[in-house]
Amino acid sequence: MFLDCSSLIAENPPRPSNGIAVTDIDGDGAFELVVAGYCTANLVLKWVDGRLVDIAGPLLADPAGPALGLAAADIDGDGREELYVVNCDRATGTKDMADRLFACFGKHWLDLFAQAENAGAANHTAAGAVAAMDRWGHGRYGFLVATDGGPLRLYELTRRGRLEDGAEEAGLDSIGAARGVTALSIVSDHMDVVTVNDGGPNELFRNLGDGNFEEIAEERGIADSRPSGRAVVALDADGDGLFDLVVGTWDGAQRYFQQRMGGGFVESAGADFSMPGRIFTVVAADFDNDGYEELFFHAHGEPNRLFGWRNDQWQELELGDAAEPKGLGTGAVAADIDGDGRLELILAHGSSHGGHGSHGGGHGAEGNAQPLSVFRPEATNNGWLRVQPLTPFGAPARGAVVSLTAGGRRQRRAVCAGSGYLCQGEPVAHFGLGPLHAVEQVEVRWPDGTVVTVDNPPADRLLTVPYPPE
C-alpha cells in the first residue's frame, strides 16, 4: 500500500517526537503539520516547493517543553485556529510545566496561559491528549484535556476574554487515567465525547444539547474495563449511517465497537483484528480512495498493521514500506500535504516510557530518537472529494459531520476534533470515490444541527462549505 517518501522532509534528524496536529499556522489557507517534540523543538512543517520545511518560530518551537499531545481550534471566534500543546514531565499526578495555548494576533503569537489573568487556570495535572470541543455549537471551541489522576479539563474563553475550566459545569470532570479522546456527534445531534482509560472503563459522554453531558458508556456497551486503552477513533465502517469506535490498546486486545440502531454498541472485532500489540495510536482514512476507510495501527517496537473493510469485515492488508518493524511509534496522522487528492501517512517516533509508564515522550528520550516518516499510497485513478466546512467565523468546523452520496452509496466522515492518541487530523472530510468521478450530493451537519446540502459538486477537488448566513 505505502511507499516511503520521507526524503520530502527537508531536515529530518532523529528526535523524540509525540503527537501530530494538522492546522493552518501561518494563516495562508494551507495546512501545516505541527509535531510535538519531547524536550526538543516542536516543528511546524509547511509544504514549500515540493519539500516539508520547518517554519516554527521560537515561541511555538518551545524546545524546553516536554510536549505530548496537541490540537487546534478557534476558541475566540476570530476565524483562526489557536493551538493547545500538552506538556507533561510526570507519568501521573501533579506536573511542573504548564500546558501552552498559543494564539496569533496579526503575526504575533502569544501563550494565553502565560498571561497574568489566565495563570491560575493553567493545567498542572499530568495529561497527554487534547481535543477540540464546541459543546453548544456556537462555533467557538474549548479544549478538552485528558488528564491522569485528575479530572478532565475543558478550557473555554469567557466573555471577559479569560480562560476558565468548564468541565465541572458541563458534567465532564470525571477522574481517571485518560488516554485517547475524541469528540463528535456519535450518539446525539451535538458533539459527544469518548475517552479511553488506562486500566479503567472507557467513557462516553452524551451531549444533552444544553452544554451539559451525561456518562452512558456502560449502558451503551463500550465501557470495557479490561485492556489498557491508548487510542480511539470513530468511523462509519459498515455504511449504516452510525459511527463505530475502534480502540487501540497497549498489550491488550484491539477493539471494534459496532454501533447498532437504537444506540447500543457490540464488540465485533475478529481474531486477526483484535490481536494484542503495543499500539500507540490509530488512524482511520481512505488511503487508496476506494470509498472505504482503512485503519492504520501505529505500533511501538513491533510492525505496524493496516486493515481494510472487505466483504463486511476487517481484513489485514499489506503495508509495504510503512510496516516499520523497528519503529518506536508515537503519533500518526493522514493528510494531503501536496494537494493531489491522495492522503499521505505521517508517522512520529519516540519513547513510550513503557507505554505507561508515562504517556509518551519519556525520560532519557535520546535513546528513543528516530526521524519522522512520510509515506505515499500507491497511485490509483480513483476519484475523490475533500470537503472543508467552516464555522460562522470562517474557521474550520471541527466536529461537523459530512455525508457524501456517489453512485447511490452514502459515506460519512466527522471533521477531526482530536483522534487516536495525542493527535488531531486535518479539518477536512476526505472521501475516495473508487472508479467514480461524479458526486450526487454532499450534506454538512454542523455541531448546532444546521444542515446544508450541495447537489452535484464537481469531484477531484476541495469543496469549501461556509456556514449558511442567517
Where are the regions a protein language model picked out?
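Beta-propeller blade repeat segments, especially FG-GAP/WD-type strand-to-loop junctions
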Residues: 1-3, 41-55, 93-113, 150-166, ...
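Repeat-based blade/solenoid architectures
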Residues: 7-20, 38, 59-71, 115-131, ...
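Gly/Ser/Thr/Pro-enriched helix-cap/hinge segments flanking short amphipathic alpha-helices
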Residues: 10-11, 314-333, 337-470
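Residue-level recognition of a conserved intra-blade site in WD40 beta-propeller repeats
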Residues: 22, 27, 72, 77, ...
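Acidic/hydrophobic-patterned starts of short beta strands in beta-sheet-rich repeat architectures
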Residues: 27-36, 77-87, 137-146, 188-196, ...
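Residue-level signature of beta-propeller blades and closely related beta-rich strand-turn architectures
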Residues: 39, 89, 149, 199, ...
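A generic tandem-repeat structural signature
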Residues: 63-126, 130-133, 143-144
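Solenoidal tandem-repeat scaffolds enriched in leucines and small polar residues
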Residues: 109-218, 223-235, 241, 246-252
